[in-house]
Amino acid sequence: RRQRQMCIRDRAMPFPITVMDHPSSRNFPLNGYKGQRGSAGRENIDYTLHKEGINIGYRYFNTVNRPVSYPFGYGLSYTEFSYDNSVVKATGKGFKASIRVKNIGKVAGRESVQLYVSAPAGGLEKPACELKAFAKTKLLQPGESEILIFNVSDYDLASFDESIQSWVSAKGKYIVKFGASIED
């Protein structure tokens, strides 16, 4: 049963349909035994073991295509925005991206734009896509637009390779997406 009544103050995490949708729920400490904090030989009752690797939070739900009540970045607005004229250009140390955001609604508003990147397949394990940058428009009047600029470095694209104890970026084609949430 889906229940979606919730007050969301900020947009920092996805809300699963049930807590059991989180892979770490199998490792939640409160599984019937309510021991004492700091008991010798037992994990602290507040301890949760995360075995999902790099796919924690929105990365997990997006990578395995599991539906959520509120996707990462979800938010409400009194107006509507359109995105167009996206440009992505490689730089010597990553890439620069820009997008035009236009208020197509009837009232003034601000839009939080998120930039997601999907890495090339192969090599190290990577989520389906990752948030790499975000920006917020100024207060846009109806019909007004603004161009937002994002700079993403090679370091932002890198993953830690334990076998060589170093940060590495995958070679190949990266896919860049803009949206107000991960589902846009």
Please provide the spans of the model-predicted regions:
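Intrinsically disordered, low-complexity Pro/Gly/Ser/Thr-rich segments with frequent PxxP/GP/PP motifs
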Residues: 123-162
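Secreted, periplasmic, or luminal enzymes acting at the cell surface/secretory milieu
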Residues: 1-5, 9-110, 116-118, 126, ...
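Secreted/periplasmic carbohydrate-active enzymes, especially glycoside hydrolases
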Residues: 159-171
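Sparse recognition of residues in long alpha-helices and their boundaries
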Residues: 114-115, 159
